[in-house]
C-alpha cells in the first residue's frame, strides 16, 4: 500500500475534492442482492493486468504464513501509472518472524527495470510472476535484491473469489463513464513452498498463502480515508477481510468484503461486516491506534445456510508503523496536510489470533492485519 499512496500524493500535492455525495460512489456490494451468491469463482482472465492509461496502481500480493517456523511476510509487485505519463514498477518484500527472531526481520523495496505485463503474468529483469495454464498455481521468482532472493510456489486449495460480477467499485456521477475505480480479487487459501535467501541465510518456507490482486484507478487519498485488512491463517481455516471507508467527498461510505474458508472449501463470502477497533489510544501521529481488534463475519454459505464468525486478537506486536509521506518532499507534505488533511500512516500488526465460527469451530492461528489512516 505504501508506494501507491506515495505516488498519488506526490503527483497531486494533496488537493481536496468537493463533496459529490453517496450517489457518486457505486460499491460492488450495492450490486449484490442475493447474499448466498455474492461471489463467483475467478478465471485466468480475471488476473490479467488491466494497465489503464489514467492514474492507477495495480498490485499482486502474496501473503505467506509458516506456522511451524514462525515466518510470515509478503511478496508484492506494484505497477503504477501517474497521470498517464509516468509508469513505474516496484518489488517489495516483507519478512518477519512472529516467534521473536528479530534478526531475521527484513524489508526491501526495489525498483524494477524492463518490466512488462503479459496476460496474468509479470516480468522484469530478475523477476517473474507466473500463473500456470491450469489456473491452479502461481510461481514468484525474484533476484532483484540480494537481501531478499525469493523462490515461492503457491497452489490453490480453495476456489478463487471475486465479489459480484467483476469485483469493482466505481466512482463518479455517471456509472457508464466513471472517473475512478477500486477492484479486488482473491485466492484466499493456498499452500506455499519454497525458499527465501537473505545474504548467506536460506529460509525454507512451507505453509499457507493468501493472494490478492488489486487495482486502484484513482488518487489514493480521494478513494479512501481509512482501510482495515486481515489475513488470518490457521492449520484448518483462513479468514480474509478488506474494508475501506471513503472521504467525506463520497459520504464516508464503507465498503467491506470478507471470506471464510476451511482447508478445502469456501465456507462463506460476505459483505458489509463490522471491524471493531478496541481500546484505541491516540499516538504521537494523532491517530487512534487500536490495542485489540475484532473482524466480524456474517454471511451465507453456497447452500444458503447462515455462517457467523469472528477473528479476534490483541495487537501486541506492531511490525511497523509506516509513515507514507516519509520519502515525499517536505513542501508537498505541507501542502497535502494543510489542504486535504492528509497524514497517512499504515500500522502493520502480526499477532496470535483466534477464529470462532458458529458451527463450533474455535482455533488459534496467526493474523497479519493493517490499520491504515489517511485523512480525517
UniProtKB/Swiss-Prot annotation:
GO terms for biological process: ER to Golgi ceramide transport; response to oxidative stress. Ceramide-binding protein that may transfer ceramides from the endoplasmic reticulum membrane to the cis-Golgi network membrane, and is thereby required for the biosynthesis of complex sphingolipids. It comes from Debaryomyces hansenii (strain ATCC 36239 / CBS 767 / BCRC 21394 / JCM 1990 / NBRC 0083 / IGC 2968). InterPro entries: Ceramide-binding_SVF1 (IPR051385), Svf1-like_C (IPR033394), Svf1-like_N (IPR013931). It is a peripheral membrane protein. The gene is SVF1. Residues 1-18 are annotated as: Peripherally associates with membranes. The keyword DNA-binding does not apply. Keywords: Cytoplasm, Endoplasmic reticulum, Golgi apparatus, Lipid transport, Membrane, Nucleus, Transport. It is found in: Golgi apparatus, cis-Golgi network membrane; Endoplasmic reticulum membrane; Cytoplasm; Nucleus. Its main location: Golgi. The keyword Nucleus applies. It holds the Pfam family Svf1_C. It comes from the Eukaryota. One of its GO terms (cellular component) is endoplasmic reticulum membrane. Belongs to the SVF1 family. This is Ceramide-binding protein SVF1. One of its GO terms (molecular function) is ceramide binding.
Amino acid at each position: 500500500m505504501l508506494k501507491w499512496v506515495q505516488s498519488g500524493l506526490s503527483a497531486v500535492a494533496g488537493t481536496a475534492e468537493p463533496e459529490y455525495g453517496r450517489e457518486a460512489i457505486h460499491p460492488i456490494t450495492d450490486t449484490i442482492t442475493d447474499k448466498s451468491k455474492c461471489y463467483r469463482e475467478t478465471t485466468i482472465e480475471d488476473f490479467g493486468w488491466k494497465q489503464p492509461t489514467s492514474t492507477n496502481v495495480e498490485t499482486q500480493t502474496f501473503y505467506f504464513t509458516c506456522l511451524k517456523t514462525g515466518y510470515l511476510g509478503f511478496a508484492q509487485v506494484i505497477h503504477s501509472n501517474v497521470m498517464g505519463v509516468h509508469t513505474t514498477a516496484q518489488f517489495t518484500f516483507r519478512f518477519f518472524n512472529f516467534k521473536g527472531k528479530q534478526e531475521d526481520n527484513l524489508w526491501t523495496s526495489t525498483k524494477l527495470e524492463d518490466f512488462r505485463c503479459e496476460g496474468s503474468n509479470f516480468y522484469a529483469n530478475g523477476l517473474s510472476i507466473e500463473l500456470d495454464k491450469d489456473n491452479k498455481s502461481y510461481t514468484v521468482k525474484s533476484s532483484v535484491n540480494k537481501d531478499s532472493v525469493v523462490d515461492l510456489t503457491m497452489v490453490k486449495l480453495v476456489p478463487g473469489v471475486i465479489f459480484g460480477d467483476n469485483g469493482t467499485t466505481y466512482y463518479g456521477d455517471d456509472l457508464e463513464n466513471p472517473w475512478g475505480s477500486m477492484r479486488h480479487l482473491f485466492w484466499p487459501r493456498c499452500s506455499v513452498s519454497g525458499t527465501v535467501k537473505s545474504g548467506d541465510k536460506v529460509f525454507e518456507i512451507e505453509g499457507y498463502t493468501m493472494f490478492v490482486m488489486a487495482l486502484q484507478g484513482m488518487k489514493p487519498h480521494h478513494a479512501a480515508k481509512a482501510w482495515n485488512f486481515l489475513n488470518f491463517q490457521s492449520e484448518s481455516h483462513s479468514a480474509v477481510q478488506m474494508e475501506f471507508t471513503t472521504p467525506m467527498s463520497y459520504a464516508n461510505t464503507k465498503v467491506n468484503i470478507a471470506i471464510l474458508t476451511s482447508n478445502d472449501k469456501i465456507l462463506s463470502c460476505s459483505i458489509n461486516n463490522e471491524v471493531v477497533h478496541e481500546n484505541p489510544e491516540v499516538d504521537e501521529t494523532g491517530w487512534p491506534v487500536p490495542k485489540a481488534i475484532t473482524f466480524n463475519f456474517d454471511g451465507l454459505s453456497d447452500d444458503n445456510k447462515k455462517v457467523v464468525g469472528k477473528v479476534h486478537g490483541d495487537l501486541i506486536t506492531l511490525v511497523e508503523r509506516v509513515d507514507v509521506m516519509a520519502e515525499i518532499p517536505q513542501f508537498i507534505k505541507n501542502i497535502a496536510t494543510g489542504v486535504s488533511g492528509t497524514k497517512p500512516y499504515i500500522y502493520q500488526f502480526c499477532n496470535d489470533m483466534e477464529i470462532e465460527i458458529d458451527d463450533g469451530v474455535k482455533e488459534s492461528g496467526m493474523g497479519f492485519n493493517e490499520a491504515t489512516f489517511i485523512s480525517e
